[in-house]
Amino acid sequence: MTRILGIDPGSQRTGIGIIDIDEDGRSRHVHHAPLMLLGEGDFSQRLKRLLQGLGELIETYRPDEVAIERVFMGKSAASALKLGHARGAAICAVVMRDLPVHEYAATEVKLALVGKGGADKVQVQHMVGIMLNLKGKLQPDAADALAVAITHAHVRATAQRLGVNTQQAWSRKK
C-alpha cells in the first residue's frame, strides 16, 4: 500500500488530498480538506501557517510520496508570485520530512483525469468523485489536490510497468 498526498497550493487556501493505492493500483480516498490561511495575519504568517499545517498533516497521515501542482502564470504577476511562495513553503514542509515530491502542471492533471488538458474544474471534480467513489460535491481546492494525487498514482503505475522513473513515464504518456 502506498499513500500519496496531493497538494493544490494557494496563498489563501491550500487544497489537501490523500489517497491510498493498493498493489493492484486501485485508489482509495483517505482524507481531503482545505488548509485555510486567511485570517492568519500578514502574508509571511500565512506561509508559516502553511508550513506548520502541512507538517502536522504529514505527521498525522504519514504519506509515502507527495504530488503538487505546478504554478501557472495567470493574468496577475503578483498573484503568481504569491502562489509561488506558497508552493515553496509547501515543498519545504515536504522535503524537510525527506519525502519525494512530484510536480504536475494543471493541464497534465486534467489530461490524466478527464482526457483533455483544457477541462474545466467541474469536469475534474466530477471525475475525482467517480474515481474515488465520493458522494456530494467536492470543494475545488480539495478536488484539485485529490486530482494531483490520482495523477501521480497513474504516472507511478506506468513508471513501474515500464521500469523507469515517474518523469520518464509521464513523458511517454503524452
From Swiss-Prot:
Reaction it catalyzes: Endonucleolytic cleavage at a junction such as a reciprocal single-stranded crossover between two homologous DNA duplexes (Holliday junction)
Name of the protein: Crossover junction endodeoxyribonuclease RuvC
Keyword Signal: no
One Pfam entry name: RuvC
Main function: The RuvA-RuvB-RuvC complex processes Holliday junction (HJ) DNA during genetic recombination and DNA repair. Endonuclease that resolves HJ intermediates. Cleaves cruciform DNA by making single-stranded nicks across the HJ at symmetrical positions within the homologous arms, yielding a 5'-phosphate and a 3'-hydroxyl group; requires a central core of homology in the junction. The consensus cleavage sequence is 5'-(A/T)TT(C/G)-3'. Cleavage occurs on the 3'-side of the TT dinucleotide at the point of strand exchange.
InterPro entries the record matches: RNaseH-like_sf (IPR012337), RNaseH_sf (IPR036397), X-over_junc_endoDNase_Mg_BS (IPR020563), X-over_junc_endoDNase_RuvC (IPR002176)
Cofactor section: Mg(2+)
Binding note for cofactor: Binds 2 Mg(2+) ion per subunit.
Any single GO BP term: DNA repair
SUPFAM superfamilies the UniProt entry points to: Ribonuclease H-like
Gene this protein is translated from: ruvC
